Each structure stands twice: as C-alpha cells, then as structure tokens.
Amino acid sequence: MNDAYVKSPLNYIGGKYRILSQIIPLFPKDINCFVDMFAGGANVGINASAKKHILNDNLIYLIDLYRKLQITPLKKVLKHIQQRIEEYDLSLTNQDGYVKLRKHYNERKDSLDLFVLIAYSFNHQIRFNNNHEFNNPFGKEKSCFNASIESNLKSFINKLQIMNIELLSQNFEELDLSELSDNDFVYCDPPYLITTGTYNDGKRGFTGWAEREERLLLNKLDGLNDKGVKFALSNVLNHKGKTNKFLEKWILDNSDYVINPINTNYSNSNYQTKNRDKFATLEVLVTNYIPQTQATLQLPLIPTERDYNEIYWQQRKLT
C-alpha cells in the first residue's frame, strides 16, 4: 500500500485501506466539502483531499471515539491506553482482564476504553447488543495493542487534529445535505445488501440494512445528482452467485452513471476475462461523473446474466 495513505487504527473488516489507491484517484479534484456518509474506520475520509470533511456514522460510540481522539493530546491518549493495559493486565491470553474492562466500559462508556477493548477483541470488531453494550468476545492469542496499531493511531490522530473535520452520528436518512453545491462531494460505503458479515450487517445494536434502506440511499443519491452534487458509491454488484438487482436496475435507469470496477481480490478472479468466476465478488465504485483518470469508461447497458461475463467485462476493459 502507498505510504502516502494513513491507515485507520481500527481494523475494520471490509475497510477500504487496501484499495485506496484505486478509489481516491477516481474522486473529483478540488473538493470543497467531502462528506463520508458511512465513515466506519474512516480510511477513506481521513485520506481524501478537501477543504472540509464531514465524517458521519450512525454508530454513536464510534463517533464519540473520534471526537475524543480529535481533542485529546497524543501523549494523553497513549498514557490512558498503557494504564488500562497495566490495570487489567491485558494480554493475548488474559480473557478475564478483557471481560472486566468490557464490563467497566459498558458502565462508564469512556471512549478511550472502547479503543483498548477493540484492540484486544475478536477480529478487532465493533459490536454492540440491543442494550448498546459492547459485546464482542476476547480475541484470544490474536488481538492486542501492538506496535502496528500504535503507529497507525499516532498518524491517524495527527491528521484528525490538523484537518478541518466535522464529526456527525446520524442515520443516513436524517443527514441533511441540502446545503451542498456542485463543488462538494459525497462518498458512500454502506452495508452491502447481498453480503453478510458483522462488518456490514448494519446492526451492531443499531439500525439494520435491508431493501428499504437500499432504496432510500439510492433515491438520496439521485437527489444529489439532480442538484449537480457529485457522488461516489462503493457497493457490490455480484457476490457468491448473487446479484444486487436493486443496484443493477438503478444503474440501468441512470445511463449517465459510471461503473468503475474495483479489484478487491476477495477471490481468485479477473474481471476483464470472459471466464471470470461467477461466484467472485464484484465490487464497484458508481459515480455520477466521468472520473478524470478513466474518462473513457462510459456506462454501457448491463447485459443478461448469460452474457454478463462474455460481453460486459470485455466492453469495460481499462485503458
């Protein structure tokens, strides 16, 4: 990965860090206000170039953590982390200490304690139950606060504190974008309708993601397009033999929208050969403008499933 990009200290499964070099060059140049509607680990938002950034996520405890990191001196953050590690004797094997800290966090909701918990939790996942209690299990022999996380945290805090960033914790339906103009830009990486996983189920003790939410988001993006506001949507068209029919129809109904295939390497596949694995994950970045770096990628009609591989991807070869 290009060292020019800062990696989030939150190891979000499904995060975009490893494909930043593919998607960020597709963004418009000279953005006034960059809006990340589903910020998650903030890998995209923290690395996108703009005069102002708005990072939004409906997980209020995640945004509370970012706010804490935004206003707290780095030395104080690191001191708090070290104190908690020593106080609860946290390690790769001490599950009892982890459980005690988790109980403490659920009683107090200290944002920095949440960060420590995430560092030692299973797969570094962020999960809350319906009572808004953090309930991710211990990451035995795999998860801890290590040198890599510390390095990422330092770089992340530095950018978070020097950039012009507004942090919001709203459901995407309630996010007011009425003041945006043609110099602003909205990026969306929502939960994916046709995939499953704790990183994108949209729940974690909060609102889930189903067909209703998918339609509302696509309608919201159409509204931005009507106002002349540029947007980019990360999503999955195909996954393990499934097709996101809502997304496919939406693209067909909006012939000016552009599909930019993203190589995620989720499976052994090559999108530009007619023998592409039909069970491969096909991730795309849909834009309502032609990216400067791929100006020849006008959106063709999406063919039927029968000739999807043979025709469509041959037409979409990158130049």
How would you name each of these model-derived features?
Residues 1-54, 58, 175-180, 184, ...:
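Class I S-adenosyl-L-methionine
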Residues 204-206:
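Glycine-rich tight-turn/loop motif centered on a GG-T
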Residues 66:
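Conserved SAM-binding loop
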Residues 63:
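Short alpha-helix immediately C-terminal to the canonical SAM-binding loop
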Residues 2-19, 25, 29, 74-187, ...:
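SAM-dependent nucleic-acid methyltransferase catalytic core
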